Swiss-Prot record:
It catalyses: [ThiI sulfur-carrier protein]-S-sulfanyl-L-cysteine + a uridine in tRNA + 2 reduced [2Fe-2S]-[ferredoxin] + ATP + H(+) = [ThiI sulfur-carrier protein]-L-cysteine + a 4-thiouridine in tRNA + 2 oxidized [2Fe-2S]-[ferredoxin] + AMP + diphosphate; [ThiS sulfur-carrier protein]-C-terminal Gly-Gly-AMP + S-sulfanyl-L-cysteinyl-[cysteine desulfurase] + AH2 = [ThiS sulfur-carrier protein]-C-terminal-Gly-aminoethanethioate + L-cysteinyl-[cysteine desulfurase] + A + AMP + 2 H(+). InterPro entries: Rossmann-like_a/b/a_fold, ThiI_AANH, ThiI_fer, ThiI_N, THUMP_dom, THUMP_ThiI, tRNA_STrfase, tRNA_sulfurtransferase_ThiI. Keywords: ATP-binding, Cytoplasm, Nucleotide-binding, RNA-binding, Thiamine biosynthesis, Transferase, tRNA-binding. Residues 57-160 form the THUMP domain. Gene3D superfamilies: 3.30.2130.30, HUPs. GO terms for biological process: thiamine biosynthetic process; thiamine diphosphate biosynthetic process; thiazole biosynthetic process; tRNA 4-thiouridine biosynthesis. It comes from Clostridium perfringens (strain 13 / Type A). One of its GO terms (molecular function) is tRNA-uracil-4 sulfurtransferase activity. It is found in: Cytoplasm. Its EC number is 2.8.1.4. This is Probable tRNA sulfurtransferase.
Length: 385
């Protein structure tokens, strides 16, 4: 008998029709990359994926963070004869110390002489005969569910052997995006959610030295690293933004500062995406959360972009965003008290209902192309793997 890890991928992949094989191949490739320095064997048994390794804990810790993997199960592989299935089932139930149980069988191997219902009844009957009054069957609300998978071999496990994974779609299957990453709570969550949908994720951070410190930059680098744990690698572009901000402050109205700065961030992200062949922009904006994120503000920001702008948090409450941040381990880093370029030079009364035509007129005082190109020419690049 061997202990293996059963890999269950997101049910959405089953719905991909003729593209299903592409998604499966990409998911396998991503799993293997995650396990490149762990000795393991990838086993396929009648469309089920299993991983064999001496370091099962290490495999679980990494594979549960692979986008596209829905669930991992620590299973025991037994020979296909029925006695070994019954004995392993009995052992699992004893280990669970449950007072009630239920058996569920998936018989994919149609050559096996019993159907799924017959296997469940026979295994359950054997357990009852061995344990007597210690346990009972409860098909509605059992303390322990015993699962039997019959394929080329047979596999036995319980619901206590299941580990929830991140789900989503295989990373790298759905194009690419440039995430405008700040040091706050929202944008790392937006980056994670886009990556979870299979979108190759890159990040740009706007640094306002000397008004923002090196610790603020280090904080954003750490956030990129954390998001990068879920991806193959992640690239962070650090763009100097001070000159742009000072020019805007000097030449534009105070109540328009925030939205014009936001439009410049969009332009820089778009120009950088053009150079790096990245298809879209992603932000951590949520409708109505701050003054620049009114419907009118978002429309004016979008006007400065020549690419699709995705906002995965757009209709989420702050509490929901914070819950995800905690789940993915970005929250504690995000709340470190270092200011970013979005929190300095904030006007007392920012315009909440800006108009595109007004911003275009205001920006005529600025050399947009020169400012954007100079910022990109002076940027730093960090790659985290």
């Amino acid at each position: 008998m061997n202990n293996l890890i059963l890999v269950k991928y997101a049910s959405e992949i089953f719905l991909k029709g003729l593209n299903k094989n592409k998604f499966e191949r990409k998911l396998k490739e991503n799993i293997r990359k995650k396990l490149k320095d762990i000795d393991h064997e990838f086993i396929t048994d009648q469309n089920r994926w299993f991983i064999k390794s001496e370091d099962l804990d290490g495999v679980i810790e990494r594979v549960k963070k692979v986008f596209g993997v829905k669930e991992l199960c620590l299973v025991t592989q037994v020979t296909g004869d029925f006695d070994s299935i019954k004995e392993e089932g009995l052992k699992k139930i004893k280990e669970s110390k449950a007072k009630s149980f239920k058996v569920e069988t998936n018989r994919a191997n149609k050559k096996f002489p019993m159907n799924s219902m017959e296997v469940s009844r026979a295994v359950g009957g054997y357990i009852l005969s061995e344990l007597g009054d210690e346990i009972e069957v409860d098909i509605h609300n059992p303390e322990c569910k015993l699962y039997v998978e019959i394929r080329g071999n047979a596999y036995v496990f319980t619901d206590k052997d299941k580990i929830k994974a991140v789900g989503g779609l295989p990373y790298g299957m759905n194009g690419s995006t440039m995430v405008m990453l700040s040091g706050g709570i929202d944008s790392p969550v937006a980056a994670y959610l886009m990556a979870r949908r299979g979108v190759e994720t890159h990040c740009v951070y706007y640094h306002s030295h000397p008004y923002t410190s090196e610790r603020a930059k280090d904080k954003v680098k750490e956030l990129a690293k954390i998001v990068g744990r879920y991806t193959e690698k992640i690239t962070l572009y650090v763009v100097p933004f001070t000159e742009i901000q000072m020019d805007i402050i000097e030449k534009c109205r105070e109540d328009e500062l925030t939205i014009i700065m936001r439009r410049f961030m969009m332009r820089v992200a778009c120009e950088l995406s053009e150079k790096k062949k990245i298809q879209s922009i992603t932000t951590g904006e949520s409708i109505g959360q701050v003054a620049s994120q009114t419907m009118e503000g978002l429309i004016v920001s979008n006007d400065a972009s020549d690419r699709p702008v995705f906002r995965p948090l757009i209709a989420m409450d702050k509490e929901d965003i914070m819950d995800i941040a905690r789940d993915i381990d970005t929250y504690e880093t995000s709340i470190l008290p270092y200011e970013d370029c979005c929190t300095i030079f904030v006007p007392k009364h920012p315009k909440t209902k800006p108009r595109v035509k007004d911003m275009i007129i205001a920006e005529r005082k600025l050399d947009i192309e020169a400012l954007v190109n100079k910022a990109i020419d002076e940027m730093e690049t960090f790659i985290f793997e």
